[in-house]
A protein has these predicted regions:
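ASCE P-loop NTPase motor core, strongest for the SF2 helicase catalytic module
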Residues: 1-203
Length: 203
């Protein structure tokens, strides 16, 4: 039921052309929800190009899950020199480093870019983060079990990728979170809550 709810939520928010953050705890089915969404996305846009950026340690897992749950999905894992190829199937899976160093990936116009473990772009000053935020994309989805690791600025950076401008620029947001006023934090929750699906194993 959680995975079905997650899929329906993704479909609903994406129809509004908004960038969702799937922030469920690890083990609650984020991968399956994304794959179900991609199957529907492909039905709607047969010639679409989707880029999925993941940590290197998860490349194999994503490949296995694709074969298990969506065997008809046309996908390719691009690692090392493979990331420099220019011909892209419906779904291209690449590491953060691969996306940050591949001119072919950076020059492509993507219909959808998905980040797994999106906390990897928490530092806006790294080349990796800058390159990924500059990718040409029509839609974006982020996944992470830890949307706020050490600072609310981590959350700002993810939303700066998903919906640039939603939370203002980094300087304004930093000034905002420096305030401990409870009403301000409530206002922040009102802004971001519609874009975040966060479920815990303890729920």
């Amino acid at each position: 039921p959680d995975q079905k709810d997650g899929f329906r939520w993704l479909m609903g928010i994406s129809r509004l052309a908004l960038g969702p953050l799937l922030a469920d705890d690890m083990g609650l089915g984020k991968t399956v929800e994304i794959l179900a969404y991609l199957e529907e996305f492909r039905e709607q846009k047969r010639d679409a190009k989707v880029l999925l950026i993941v940590p290197a340690s998860l490349l194999g897992n994503w490949g296995r899950e694709c074969l298990k749950f969506t065997p008809s999905l046309d996908f390719s894992i691009r690692h090392g020199k493979e990331a420099k190829k220019k011909d892209f199937p419906f779904l291209t899976i690449v590491t953060y480093q691969g996306a940050a160093t591949s001119a072919a990936i950076q020059e492509e116009k993507w219909d959808l870019v998905i980040l797994d473990e999106a906390q990897n772009i928490k530092n806006r000053n790294t080349k990796q983060t800058k390159v990924i935020k500059a990718l040409d994309r029509k839609q974006a989805i982020a996944m992470t079990g830890t949307p706020i690791e050490n600072s609310l600025l981590n959350l700002w950076s993810i939303f700066d990728f998903l919906s640039p401008g939603l939370l203002g620029d980094e300087k304004d947001f930093a000034s905002f979170v420096d305030s401990t006023a409870e009403d301000k934090m409530e206002n922040l929750k009102k802004v971001v809550t519609p874009f975040i699906l966060r479920r815990l194993k303890s729920d």
